[in-house]
Regions:
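Phosphate-binding/catalytic loops
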Residues: 58, 70-158
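Conserved active-site segments centered on acidic
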Residues: 1-56, 131-140, 155
């Protein structure tokens, strides 16, 4: 979802890959994007690779466990350009309450209209991220500033 929002709202290129991905876009995510006027029907999820990480300026993940897995699988050197999508602007003090995790809509059976409303904050977030990447707005806080805290999170939890 974030890639399509970024490309649509910011008119900028983005890549999309995940640590755990299926063969097609999740139907709920696709319906949410369609409700926002974005066609993602041709999207095919890709698995993240070290080569892809090396090609990117920034990597945004959906939760602390994914950050932990990213550096565990591909190296701590990525911590300087890895961020939590939910809040890439503050340094977390704790991950105990799950506040830095984006809940995947694929596990939510509510109607699309409710999910569209719940995930509306993502539209604003991608615009904020683009501003930060362009040197405007709030500065991004990379994983390198809280790497030890992140490594305390179970990398296999979601």
């Amino acid at each position: 979802m974030a890639r399509y929002l970024y490309e649509h709202l910011c008119n900028a290129q983005a890549l999309s890959a995940g640590l755990d991905c299926g063969g097609v876009i999740n139907d709920r995510a696709e319906r949410i994007l369609r409700a926002w006027g974005i066609d993602a029907s041709a999207h095919r999820p890709a698995t993240i690779t070290r080569e892809l990480c090396d090609r990117t300026d920034a990597i945004f993940v959906m939760g602390p466990s994914y950050l932990h897995r990213l550096v565990w699988q591909y190296g701590d050197d990525l911590a300087g350009k890895a961020y939590l999508f939910a809040d890439p602007f503050t340094r977390p003090e704790s991950f105990a309450n799950g506040e830095y995790k984006v809940i995947d809509p694929s596990y939510d059976d509510r109607p699309t209209s409710e999910l569209t409303e719940q995930y509306a904050w993502m539209r604003e977030r991608v615009v904020q991220i683009q501003s930060a990447l362009m040197g405007r707005g709030l500065p991004l806080v990379p994983l390198s500033q809280y790497l030890s805290l992140c490594k305390s999170v179970d990398k296999w939890s979601h």
